[in-house]
């Protein structure tokens, strides 16, 4: 995990995929491009998620539950 944006979303009644898509849309509106990676707590990510060919969703123990770490494009 390098530089990025931390997103908090505690809407437990909303599908995790939809929550991540909302975070990605905000990230794109703020920075002008989609994040390269989205890290989530392994407890939140029960199954692998396929979103698009640009953003990889990966588990990481360093991310707190209900948070998403959206990583900037590496140079």
Question: What residue ranges belong to the model's regions?
Answer:
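N-terminal acidic leader/helix
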Residues: 1-30
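Short, surface-exposed beta-edge/turn micro-motifs
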Residues: 3, 34-37, 66-67
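Short beta-strand-to-loop capping motifs
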Residues: 10, 40-43, 72
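Short secondary-structure junctions
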Residues: 29-34, 52
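Amphipathic, hydrophobic secondary-structure cores in small proteins
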Residues: 36-39, 46
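Short, basic interhelical loop/turn and adjoining N-cap
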Residues: 44-46, 56
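C-terminal edge-of-domain segments
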Residues: 52-75
């Amino acid at each position: 995990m390098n530089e990025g944006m931390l997103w908090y979303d505690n809407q437990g009644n909303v599908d995790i995929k939809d929550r991540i898509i909302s975070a990605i849309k905000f990230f794109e509106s703020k920075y002008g491009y989609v994040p390269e990676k989205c890290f989530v707590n392994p407890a939140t990510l029960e199954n692998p998620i396929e979103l698009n060919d640009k953003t990889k969703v990966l588990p990481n123990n360093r991310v707190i539950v209900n948070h998403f770490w959206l990583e900037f494009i590496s140079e």
